């Protein structure tokens, strides 16, 4: 019997241990192959797909993420496989197998698995690539459907890339074998574990880091997040690592000392197993909780943004079709009757119309950070105009005294209150006249379109506006015209037609909502679709890590279960013990990852000024369902494997 035959028999003998790793590799290869096939598909070009280069860039970024994650996962798995088989390697060495022969045998085993994974992954990729192309055709509104094609470059990149990856990481891991002595290999599984210890200072540090990271995340707006994202990431990672290596030990030692509950039922066995294996599990729990947080945060944030996209568009572009005439005495951008006739011919229904004038003013505003001032611009309008649009949009109306005013900003992200409530502010007209108002609370509502980047409206009482407008010639005022359309999402064609009717020198003064909404929606939907693929890969890999960890301890668990049965522990109690131990590994990282993601969701809600609680619950619930199913299947396989060894 040669080494290749032994390698094949070893794979079949350790099939339960290898299956999760193999399937994870197959999925990674298949996703890589499908994405590569799309990127290099002859039909994927700018002529056929609007924004085709952007799509390719997104998919290429996803490929980099997959490769980096595969490096991490394969390295971890190879290390776990070698650790689990130390005793077997020690016995083979004792019976005369040289370290060179041992390394060859392991090399053959891993090479067979990697070649099979590449072949199966490409086969699965070919099988599902047509479905992927159909989905992408629908999502990207492709002019000519993307046909099924065998892309040679995808084959070459997938086979060459993963062969190099598997072989390089395998050779690096084999270097560990020659450093181990026979006695260390044989006794590796027999080394007694001492009660784990912890540092009080590191325990406090973990809680402080997590608390600080959560606080920074929960209180951040869009401007803050630009500066806080890396500190939050570092604090949460440090806090999570020391939470599992230190704080969890402190918590379980506290449970260990509670004798009234420690000796109740099977708690003595479950808690003892958990605390004595905690140091072994700490790194894996840290990694899987971080992976869970990444999956929930990435998928959740994109899904929440997608769900809130329509409201964001209606906020930033207040009317479906709108424009500003910088000389209110005439129409240079477009005549209202021209727009109305075009909309009528396209069977677009107008729900309300805005035709209002405003007076440009300037004021001194604080920079977002620091104590410096800058000159800013605003458009002074009447509360009558504001309330007209507010009623149509379902916003509360506001009534002002003659000396009162407030600032309205259409953008809710990157917004800092311009003035404090009750503050007296000065505004300057072009004529040199200075206006003074007591400022009411700032509103961030989508009322009228921004004018040349001027997003602030200064809303004053009707009486005050009428008095001021009498002294300002109409040609020095600005006119804002806008139309809100029924089912505006379906008005892309007429919106683009109106855009083409605007003189080139006035294109920046004209705004439509439907075309930009469809482009952004398409981009976010693509990100969500790609993100789901990558998230599923992360989820499978995370589950594989848990599965692998349990099967590396299966021999010790089998010995323990046999001892428990001999002292009278029932089958029901043994099933309960195993279920709790597996549940701990599956759901503690889930809880930690969910908490991390929850604060990321809170930050996004603050940034968008929107309640995204329902979307967060949906994402977390879906993930929990898949995690629970994975747990049930793994528990069944693991219990059966343990009991078969008795």
Swiss-Prot record:
Q: Which InterPro entries has this protein been placed in?
A: ABC-4_Integral_Memb_Prot (IPR052536), ABC3_permease_C (IPR003838), ABC_permease_BceB-typ (IPR027022)
- One GO CC term, this protein: plasma membrane
* GO biological-process terms attached to the record: transmembrane transport
TM ranges are 20-40, 54-74, 115-135, 154-174, 203-223, 232-252, 285-305, 523-543, 582-602, 613-633
Keywords, alphabetical: Cell membrane, Membrane, Transmembrane, Transmembrane helix, Transport
Q: Which Pfam families match?
A: FtsX
Please give the PANTHER family that the UniProt record associates with this protein: ABC TRANSPORTER PERMEASE PROTEIN (PTHR46795:SF1), ABC TRANSPORTER PERMEASE-RELATED-RELATED (PTHR46795)
What broad class describes the main subcellular location of this protein? membrane
The UniProt record lists the keyword Cell membrane = yes
Does the keyword field hold Transmembrane? yes
So which domain of life are we looking at? Bacteria
Q: Which family does it belong to?
A: Belongs to the ABC-4 integral membrane protein family.
The entry's localization annotation reads:
Cell membrane
Q: What's the name of the protein?
A: Uncharacterized ABC transporter permease YvcS
Report the source organism: Bacillus subtilis (strain 168)
Membrane-protein topology: Multi-pass membrane protein
